[in-house]
């Protein structure tokens, strides 16, 4: 999933954001880790960078599922699932059923959330400074 779906989606989005919007985008691969991962980062001057990562999480499969004759595709006692992780430490979610386009949309949705957080924090700081000036 990381090599066939996530990485191509990140590369496609990264090229578009760099070419059309002159954003500084970096994509890193960490296939040599215990939990292989890919990371999509947009660098922001003097602010925390936006980072959207996907790593594979190892999960145990129940012995009952392996022995179930109605589930012949389950043959191993371990499975690996792609989960997101973010710049702010929030818990991620399973993205194994997303295709390339859905993954691009998800990255953009999280980037929009990041921009909204920056806007909210900026407005809060500005209103706090104006209150101090008024005093």
Residue ranges, per PLM feature:
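Contiguous, amphipathic alpha-helical segments that mediate oligomerization or scaffolding
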Residues: 1-24
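Intrinsic disorder/low-complexity polar-acidic segments
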Residues: 35-135
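Charge-dense, helix-prone N-terminal extensions
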Residues: 27-30
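Sparse, context-dependent recognition of short Cys/His-centered cofactor- or disulfide-binding micro-motifs
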Residues: 10, 25, 88, 92
